[in-house]
């Protein structure tokens, strides 16, 4: 298992490398910070700004550091440099606004370039207990059941027993459909050795 301190040092260095004097504010948020807290090496880093002009600065800054745009998504850009993935998202009013729109409290974490931490009141307690508590947002409603399955595979438990019952039913329905669902390899999991 990777040490929390090692990952934190890498994140700290990343923030320092991206920052420059009088630069616009930017922040990391979501799953990468969750993984760092849990001592897991993040598969990617979610990063954004509070305005479109600041986002343009951030993209330009990352490109100047060697990151290249690999794909454009509904949520922003996927950038890569030396096997480090960045999901550069569209701006929000504030880090608090951004994390209030995530799916679960364990993902409701953000840290800005001044190292100020923003989080839901139960984020760290839920992470320590591997408890999955859904936030009441509409942004992820279409994929919430699939995301719950992803977290149960990481040994998270639901805060609400009723949710566990619903998920079991969803797993059964999904299992029946599985043979007809095509497999798509995620670019982040691509391994040249597998060819």
Locations of regions flagged by a protein language model:
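Catalytic cores of the polymerase beta-like nucleotidyltransferase superfamily
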Residues: 1-195
């Amino acid at each position: 298992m990777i040490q929390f301190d090692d990952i934190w040092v890498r994140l700290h260095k990343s923030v320092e490398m991206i920052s420059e004097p009088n630069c616009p504010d930017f922040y990391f948020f979501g799953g990468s910070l969750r993984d760092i807290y849990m001592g897991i090496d993040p598969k990617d880093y979610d990063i954004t700004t509070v305005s479109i002009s600041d986002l343009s600065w951030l993209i330009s800054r990352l490109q100047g550091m060697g990151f290249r745009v690999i794909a454009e998504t509904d949520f922003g850009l996927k950038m890569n440099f030396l096997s480090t993935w960045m999901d550069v998202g569209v701006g929000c009013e504030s880090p608090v606004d951004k994390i209030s729109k995530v799916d679960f409290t364990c993902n409701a974490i953000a840290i800005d370039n001044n190292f100020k931490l923003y989080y839901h009141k139960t984020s760290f307690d839920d992470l320590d207990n591997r408890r999955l508590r859904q936030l009441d947002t509409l942004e992820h409603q279409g994929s919430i059941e699939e995301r719950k399955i992803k977290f149960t595979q990481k040994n998270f438990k639901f805060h609400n027993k009723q949710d566990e019952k619903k998920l079991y039913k969803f797993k059964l329905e999904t299992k029946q459909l599985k043979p007809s669902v095509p497999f798509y390899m995620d670019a982040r999991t691509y391994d040249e050795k597998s060819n």
